């Protein structure tokens, strides 16, 4: 039917007959000549329908946007002054000799070049939305990324092995999606949150290097830019230490960016430990494009009269930090007030600040309502510690460390990305990757009054930290590592526990009894007793990588058929009700069901 793609038709085909298939992107009647912009996945080509060919011209008069056509014609130069440098085919046009309507179209609910469509409209009519060039480009880049990943891993000796989609429910942080078993009444499968345990078992089984590009499922609370199903580049390898694993996969990401975007990422990636990341940026995935850092002022604030500062400085797990904004003294009060409202989202009760007008004058050179409640020695130490200069602004965070880190960490990014930040050189618009390492092995859950695994309970402790799991879990560090790029976690992993007795120690630290551990993880504990090799791995979020590479506004723009923030598919209206007969077969009865809000 077709000899050439529309978007690839060029001067190389001048005076040749081509057959094209595609959709009417736009039809223009110029009083005697009809122009059709015909579109396929490769782009557009201009087709000319001349009244001298009566049958072609008559058919062209009837076509409308999104009609599916087959056109045969001669490639010729466009008339002088009508070329389009934005198109590969912009120097030529096709004079139609034949025009066949393969399928007409009803009037589309929107124009494909409308950039102001709501996401609801786009997702409801996803098939049409996917015809848009931007969506075509996004998904083709996604394909290219997966191909580059496969080529790299294949060359490194990794084997693509599928793991089960119907598996056992085990705690990994989020809620599982459960699948009732009809033939095993009262029992449920779970859809995997990750192939974590299976890939470890594959290492015990001597497959040495495994990978899989697979779907994972998490029944999480509603959050922006999260999907209940997502795609993971999942990898595991035996007989490699933490540094070797990081080096290997850093090379993979560097190659993907080079071959897909022609971007040279730094070699090697910088490495930062978790404590430094939290101390300087309030985040374990800091955006290194932003040139702002925390200054810890906790010790300085312990004896000041300003109770907001001294109270936080003296409380357990309290923290006081300063965020110096060079040139921020020029920031209008309205912008400062807006930032005050912004940090409230993260639990901050306010946003104190000091403008440094003339630091040589001491207290008299500082402008802020809080200055009167801070003694001269503390003020001098604040200026010295932050390195503030005339014309600078210092924001302060004072509260529990988590609130300060969340609020001032978000403020740091907000200021850096603002027009003010970009105009004042506080933001570098480039790719800034980073490894974050030495994560805490455990974190304390105040609600349940027990320790939980920071990553997952199969992460190995750092050398020399094994005994801390029982004596001081809060000081125990792990062999975990995250790859961060421009404030996003691209992937994370760890060296795994390969000895059953160490795995049992972790379960004890997490208050998982031997009986519960055997019930939930007995298959893993048993496997570890058969000479399990040292092993570790990493998993990358494919959706997130492609979102960053395309510059898409939402992760939903790089997934063909995504769910909404309410975990619904507006195209198919999933999830849906099922009939009573199906429920009875599954031994399920619904109770107190609330109406589902669609959209």
Curated annotation (Swiss-Prot):
Annotated GO biological process: aspartyl-tRNA aminoacylation
Reactions that this protein is recorded to catalyse: tRNA(Asx) + L-aspartate + ATP = L-aspartyl-tRNA(Asx) + AMP + diphosphate
InterPro entries hit by this protein: Aa-tRNA-synt_II (IPR004364), aa-tRNA-synth_II (IPR006195), aa-tRNA-synth_II/BPL/LPL (IPR045864), Asp-tRNA-ligase_1 (IPR004524), Asp-tRNA-ligase_1_N (IPR047089), Asp/Asn-tRNA-synth_IIb (IPR002312), AspRS_core (IPR047090), GAD-like_sf (IPR004115)
Statement: the UniProt record of this protein carries the keyword Glycoprotein: no
GO molecular function: aspartate-tRNA ligase activity; aspartate-tRNA(Asn) ligase activity; ATP binding; nucleic acid binding
Site (Important for tRNA non-discrimination): 30, 81
E.C. designation(s): 6.1.1.23
Gene3D superfamilies attached to this UniProt entry: Bira Bifunctional Protein, Domain 2 (3.30.930.10), GAD-like domain (3.30.1360.30), Nucleic acid-binding proteins (2.40.50.140)
Disulfide bridge map: none
Cellular component GO terms held in the UniProt record: cytoplasm
Main location (coarse class): cytoplasm
Keywords, alphabetical: Aminoacyl-tRNA synthetase, ATP-binding, Cytoplasm, Ligase, Nucleotide-binding, Protein biosynthesis
Positions annotated to bind L-aspartate: 172, 218, 455, 496
Location of the region described as Aspartate in the Swiss-Prot/TrEMBL record: 196-199
Compartments reported by the entry: Cytoplasm
Binding positions for ATP per the UniProt entry: 218-220, 227, 489, 541-544
HAMAP family, sorted: Asp_tRNA_synth_type1 (MF_00044)
Family: Belongs to the class-II aminoacyl-tRNA synthetase family. Type 1 subfamily.
UniProt subunit comment: Homodimer.
Purpose: Aspartyl-tRNA synthetase with relaxed tRNA specificity since it is able to aspartylate not only its cognate tRNA(Asp) but also tRNA(Asn). Reaction proceeds in two steps: L-aspartate is first activated by ATP to form Asp-AMP and then transferred to the acceptor end of tRNA(Asp/Asn).
Database matches in NCBIfam families: aspS_bact, PRK00476.1
PANTHER family: ASPARTATE--TRNA LIGASE, MITOCHONDRIAL, ASPARTYL/LYSYL-TRNA SYNTHETASE
Protein name, UniProt field: Aspartate--tRNA(Asp/Asn) ligase
Organism ancestry: Bacteria, Pseudomonadati, Pseudomonadota, Betaproteobacteria, Burkholderiales
């Amino acid at each position: 039917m077709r000899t050439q793609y529309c978007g690839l038709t060029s001067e190389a085909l001048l005076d040749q007959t081509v057959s094209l298939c595609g959709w009417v992107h736009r039809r223009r009647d110029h009083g005697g000549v009809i122009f059709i912009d015909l579109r396929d996945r490769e782009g557009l080509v201009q087709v000319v329908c001349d009244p001298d060919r009566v049958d072609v011209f008559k058919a062209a008069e009837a076509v409308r946007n999104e009609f599916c056509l087959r056109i045969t014609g001669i490639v010729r130069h466009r008339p002088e002054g009508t070329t389009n440098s934005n198109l590969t085919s912009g120097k030529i046009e096709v004079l139609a000799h034949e025009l066949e309507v393969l399928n007409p179209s009803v009037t589309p609910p929107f124009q494909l070049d409308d950039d102001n469509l709501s996401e609801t409209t786009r997702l409801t009519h996803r098939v049409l939305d996917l015809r848009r060039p931007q969506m075509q480009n996004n998904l083709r880049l996604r394909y290219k990324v997966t191909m580059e990943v496969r080529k790299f891993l294949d060359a490194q000796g990794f084997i693509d092995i599928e793991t089960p989609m119907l598996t056992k429910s085990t705690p990994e942080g989020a809620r599982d999606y459960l699948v009732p078993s009809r033939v095993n009444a009262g029992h449920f499968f779970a859809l995997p949150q990750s192939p974590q345990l299976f890939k470890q078992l594959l290492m015990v089984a001597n497959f040495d290097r495994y990978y899989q590009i697979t779907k994972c499922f998490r029944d999480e609370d509603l959050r922006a830019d999260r999907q209940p199903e997502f795609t993971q580049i999942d990898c595991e390898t035996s007989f490699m230490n933490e540094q070797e694993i990081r080096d290997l996969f850093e090379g993979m990401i560097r190659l993907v960016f080079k071959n897909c975007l022609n971007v040279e990422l730094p070699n090697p990636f910088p490495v930062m430990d978790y404590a430094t990341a939290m101390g300087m940026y309030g985040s374990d995935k800091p955006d290194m494009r932003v040139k702002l850092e925390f200054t810890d002022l906790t010790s300085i604030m312990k004896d000041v009269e300003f109770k907001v500062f001294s109270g936080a400085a003296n409380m357990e797990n309290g923290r006081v930090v300063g965020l110096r904004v060079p040139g921020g003294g020029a920031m209008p009060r309205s912008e400062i007030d807006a930032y005050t409202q912004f940090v409230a989202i993260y639990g901050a009760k306010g946003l104190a600040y000091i403008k440094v007008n003339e630091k040589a004058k001491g207290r008299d050179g500082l402008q802020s309502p809080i200055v009167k409640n801070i003694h001269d020695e503390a003020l001098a130490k604040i200026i010295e510690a932050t390195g503030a200069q005339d014309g600078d602004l210092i924001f302060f965070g004072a509260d529990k460390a988590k609130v300060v880190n969340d609020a001032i960490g978000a403020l740091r990014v907000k200021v850096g990305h603002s027009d003010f930040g970009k105009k004042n050189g506080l933001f570098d618009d480039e790719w800034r990757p980073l490894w974050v390492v030495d994560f805490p092995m455990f974190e304390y859950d105040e609600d349940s009054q027990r320790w939980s695994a920071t990553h997952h309970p199969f992460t190995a402790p750092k050398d020399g930290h094994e005994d801390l799991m029982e004596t001081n879990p809060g000081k125990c560090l792990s062999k975990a590592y995250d790859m961060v790029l421009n404030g996003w976690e691209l992937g994370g992993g760890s060296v795994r526990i390969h000895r059953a007795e160490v795995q049992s120690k972790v379960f004890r630290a997490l208050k998982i009894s031997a009986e519960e551990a055997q019930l939930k993880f007995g298959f893993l504990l048993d496997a570890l007793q058969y000479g399990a090799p040292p092993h570790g791995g990493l998993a990358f979020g494919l959706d997130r990588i492609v979102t960053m590479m395309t510059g898409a506004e939402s992760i939903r723009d790089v997934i063909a058929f995504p769910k909404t923030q309410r975990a619904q598919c507006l195209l198919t209206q999933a999830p849906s009700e099922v009939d009573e007969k199906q429920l009875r077969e599954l031994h399920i009865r619904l109770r107190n069901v609330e109406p589902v809000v669609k959209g």
